[in-house]
Amino acid sequence: VHDVPVPKGGGVPVFLGSVAAMMVFLPLDGHLIAIILAGLLLVSVGVWDDASDISPILRLLVNFLAAGIVIGAGIGIAYITNPFGSGVIHLNQPQLSFNFLGEQRSIWLLADLLALLWIPFMINAVNWSSGLDGQIAGVVPIAAATIGILSFRFSADVTQWPVAIAAFSLAGAFLGYLPYSFYPQKSMPGYGGAGYAGFMLAVLAILSTTKVGTAMVVLGVPLIDAVYVGVSRI
């Protein structure tokens, strides 16, 4: 509870800062365009929600739409580590192939479905854990930097460099916002900032070789809190 009104638009500068860094250091390919568009959608709806308190159902639909944008760009959970032994479990089957505008396309049903569930879950998990001053601005840089550092372990794999750069861009944006988030807060990240943070961490976990397991370990406390909140509200 705040004694004086506190603006909730902190997600806007965080979004602009991270996107500016990514556009400077990364090629503007299909993945990055989809991430920017989905992030812009989440932040815009978040600002709208903070101002007008829109329907939770509409917010959830927007979460799935944001997930659908990046999935449509080819971002999906192609495999997961086998919890019952060594190796991985591939999720690239079954596939639904079709012709679109003269090009052969395919949908990996399991991979895309898992991503469609994982991304909205992370968006809401991070948002539900944003109740304390400085919590989001402190947790997100740690999680993003961890993904970035682990991506550097595979520096010989050139596909991991963009993941590391995007992760450090997100971490830097939230670190820059951190002084304004300490008690007493001068600004709140709001639904837009928290939703964008959860979205980016979910996507980075998918794109990195560490996959979702790393995000679940780094964000263990917020994820457990999210499950508790979800169960308590049923």
Q: Can you describe what each PLM-predicted range is?
A:
Residues 232-234:
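Juxtamembrane non-transmembrane "cap" segments at the membrane-aqueous interface
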